[in-house]
Amino acid sequence: MAARNKARKRAFQILFEAEQRGVDPKTAMADWIRLARTDDRQPPVTEYTMQLVEGCEAHAERIDELLSSYSVGWSLDRMPVVDRNVLRLGTYELLWEDDVPDAVVLDEAVQLAKEFSTDESPAFVNGLLARLMELKPTLKR
């Protein structure tokens, strides 16, 4: 598995855990870092994972606003927690990580949805992120 692929997966897991525990993502990430230092079985949290988690947290309000606006028929609180966090990660990477090709962002988000969510989730994630990708030039960051 490529390094960035692993970093995305870990960032998603941290975001998901933070929401489930009701803590901010940086707190959950600090716990992962601490665990990696004491448990050899726990992979380290890479720089790119930290960049993704911190970016999602820094832009959380705008990301959720965009997801709420463009997820037709779905409010954020009705979305499965997995989908919500895959979409948050994908939206952040799509809009704020300019060195990552948009097609890679969509593909990676769909793969996370396939691995961790429902059978319907990959199509939902792909559709919503594709819409944001189309609108990217006009969206205010």
Q: What would you call each of these model-derived segments?
A:
Residues 1-141:
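N-terminal interaction/assembly modules
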